[in-house]
Amino acid sequence: MTNHSVILCILDGWGNNKNSQFNAIAQADTPYWDSIISQYPQSNIVTHGPDVGLPDRQIGNSEVGHISLGSGRIVLQDLCRINEEIKNIRKNTHLLEFTEQIKRNNGICHIAGLLSDGGIHSSLSHMLDIIDALSYLKIQVVIHIFLDGRDTPPISALKYINILCSHIKDLSNVSIATISGRYYSMDRDNRLDRTTKAYNSIAFGHGKRYEDPISAVQDNYNAGITDEFIIPCVIGNYQGMNPTDGFIMTNFRSDRVIQILKMITEDQNTNHITLKNTIGMIKYSNELNIPCLFPNKKISNTLGEIISNQQLHQLRIAETEKYAHVTFFFNGGREEVFENEERIIIPSPSVTTYDLVPEMSAYEITDTLIKKINLQKYSLIIINYANADMVGHTGNIEATKKAITTLDQCLGKILKCIHNTNYILVITADHGNAEEMFDVQNNMPYTAHTLNPVPFVVCNYPKKIKLKNGRLSDVAPTILEILNIKQPEEMTGISLIDTSN
């Protein structure tokens, strides 16, 4: 081992794009970033498709990105894995056990999930396959639709609803029960007032009532409300859940289903309805004691585990929105803290959308980081700045430019702090977002992630080096080389430090 320590700074949603038009990063005031890329070695990293275990041209996301960063290998992601395993869904033993209990109780099955082809949290085809399997098994099904508008265009819900309606039109035992924008049904920041509105529509049939889903969406559009923010509402004569019913969550990403599933499965008060027969696509969390249709495979010898096995200290810092990413996902789906691993969560601002506070909690993260650097205790510090992604998702380019300038100032403070220390600053991102903010073809804001590469920069390294282009799974091996720690055989990524010269 060397005396070096590493700070891995993940600029969530910061991509590279040579086109400066509608590019919040290129248009923002970034003197420190400009200085960084002019004097330190850099390369490009791919964050999408097969390079991160996703289908070809499938946009990456924060979960996939952090799994790839932390594991140091290409992990076949849940989207691809489930695409294969769901072909035999009618014979899935977990589904058959679930449906047998529904039949014994004379209940019905509630299916809930994000109706989207964004591929980030869910797959529309997965929901349709499960509906078909339940219909085949003679189970009555009601569907609770979560609308996207974030990983898809802001006004695109009717496209997916029409696909769903066309698919179920000849299935007499299947109907649509409720609709909710993901702002309510998929909150992950403990804003339980939002989650409660979605829960009340599902559990009790509370909310404005519409004859059909098309009318519900169109009414919200007429009021200026886009997909993500559509207020939970009820379709037809749906009256709510019964304790004898079953519940399937079709999202395969965990962070945005935990709150709503906790409300559905755990007793909250005497007026609360819970469904004990609940199942998910994967194991979402140790917080949720529910089975899954497609069990996850364990990822061993991640970067965090290796650092711990070396008896070295490591630290993770992020604000609420990205805390799970630098901990749970970075550790390969492990919730337990490694030995000598410390975690600090900085609360995210309590606002409706982050364009209202584009600084988010970046300054607080930076101040905390600097205090920890000065302790000279940690061999590895991992931080995530959420601004470029979370503000970028709003589609507000002016606010996103402010977010980028905030990050630039934070980078300047970090560089000043590590000057004349043994800390090496490694800067990268999990995917792009802020560098491409308008869809010219459809003449609307572009709020999703991008296919652009992200930067990889190594600052404060004691000798001159060159960096190769690569993929996210190459970052952990690079850090191990800097720390002079042997790369385990499970890590199939390669160090990006170019030793050809």
Swiss-Prot record:
It comes from Ehrlichia ruminantium (strain Welgevonden). The lineage of its organism: Bacteria, Pseudomonadati, Pseudomonadota, Alphaproteobacteria, Rickettsiales. This is 2,3-bisphosphoglycerate-independent phosphoglycerate mutase. GO terms for cellular component: cytosol. Pathway: Carbohydrate degradation; glycolysis; pyruvate from D-glyceraldehyde 3-phosphate: step 3/5. It is an enzyme of class 5 (isomerase). Keywords: Glycolysis, Isomerase, Manganese, Metal-binding. Binds 2 manganese ions per subunit. Mn(2+) 2 binds at D12, S62, D430, H431. Mn(2+) 1 binds at D389, H393, H449. InterPro entries: Alkaline_phosphatase_core_sf, BPG-indep_PGM_N, Metalloenzyme, PGAM_B_sf, Pgm_bpd_ind. The active site is at S62.
